[in-house]
């Protein structure tokens, strides 16, 4: 269905607003995926704060023009689905990686995080990022472990010196 100029401008405006608020963006191919599967993916994504859009490449190019997402221009070929993480940077990558495991035709093309392009081969780096609570827990664990380890080491040295 052909879109008139006003509809295209509305779509560009809406997606541009989403793109500017997103903390990360992931692009994947949509070839060979049934509509009901895409609907399930969208619902699952919406539940964790990820906006998923199927948008024409020409419109997407206009959306990313003069933004940190401009590095996606080269991979916008064919039929694509774009996920915008609104809360945690890993969410869009994680949901696409999970979807890829069950759908062999679904291929991740790349992502953008903090203005840098992440190729599909390194998408697991983004999907494996800890969320805020996990990062704080890991930091506290490291701090506790290192301080206890230092104390044990000092006590061991002192006990060796006394003997």
UniProtKB/Swiss-Prot annotation:
Record Gene3D superfamilies: 3.30.70.1730
UniProt entry keywords in alphabetical sequence: Ribonucleoprotein, Ribosomal protein, RNA-binding, rRNA-binding
GO cellular component, one term: ribosome
GO molecular function, one term: large ribosomal subunit rRNA binding
Database matches in InterPro entries: Ribosomal_uL10 (IPR001790), Ribosomal_uL10-like_sf (IPR043141), Ribosomal_uL10_bac (IPR022973), Ribosomal_uL10_bac_type (IPR047865)
SUPFAM superfamilies on file: Ribosomal protein L10-like (SSF160369)
Superkingdom of origin organism: Bacteria
One Pfam family of this chain: Ribosomal_L10
GO biological process: translation
Known function: Forms part of the ribosomal stalk, playing a central role in the interaction of the ribosome with GTP-bound translation factors.
Family: Belongs to the universal ribosomal protein uL10 family.
Subunit structure: Part of the ribosomal stalk of the 50S ribosomal subunit. The N-terminus interacts with L11 and the large rRNA to form the base of the stalk. The C-terminus forms an elongated spine to which L12 dimers bind in a sequential fashion forming a multimeric L10(L12)X complex.
Protein name per Swiss-Prot or TrEMBL: Large ribosomal subunit protein uL10
